[in-house]
Amino acid sequence: MQKKRLFQSLALFLSLLLALPALAGCGDAAGEPPNADGVTIITTLFPLYDFARALTAGTDANVSLLLPPGVESHSFEPSPADIIAIQKADVFAYTGEYMETWAHEIIDGLDGTQGTTEDGTFLTIGSLVVADCSLGIQLDEIEAHADEQPHEGHGHGNYDPHIWTDPTQAATMAGTLTEALSAADPEHAETYRANCEAYQAELAELDADFVALMSGAK
């Protein structure tokens, strides 16, 4: 039980660590128009928003968050304006089918071709690159209890889709997003990959700290 509480605390800490820079960025960018020359990236959740901001540092990229604060991702219903914005974007990044079930409905409604890279797979639809950031990640199974009832709007199935709370999985997500960004904007691919390498190094250091802390809790 102690280890479970510790793991939950660490997961919450990582979530806050990833979200705080994004929250600060939102405040700084309030009222600023998008850069017409920069690549446009739409992300679904705060962790992906933070990944995208870190990966595009040093460029004129326009990173936006689709879900308003406080909105439940599982039950979110994109408006027609949201769908149009996604179609006009250069990159659309989401966590995966178990987290944003509605994302596949949007994607399936569009004509596209499958493109692959050495490090992952992404979908190209015209000029739009779609990044499923759960690719390459084995989701953890959730132990079902007979006395538990599924909550409305939380259609996880038997898997935990909150993959960004694990630093190693977060690093994989960042790598997938990097390849999508590089495909959409080859001119800045070198910058994206350099930023990704630095970001993944920070996550690896964080993971090492987690492992050391967990070892001490045994």
What are these regions (language model features)?
Residues L12-L14, G25-K218:
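Extracytoplasmic metal-acquisition and chelation regions
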Residues Q2-F13:
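Bacterial N-terminal signal peptides that target proteins for export
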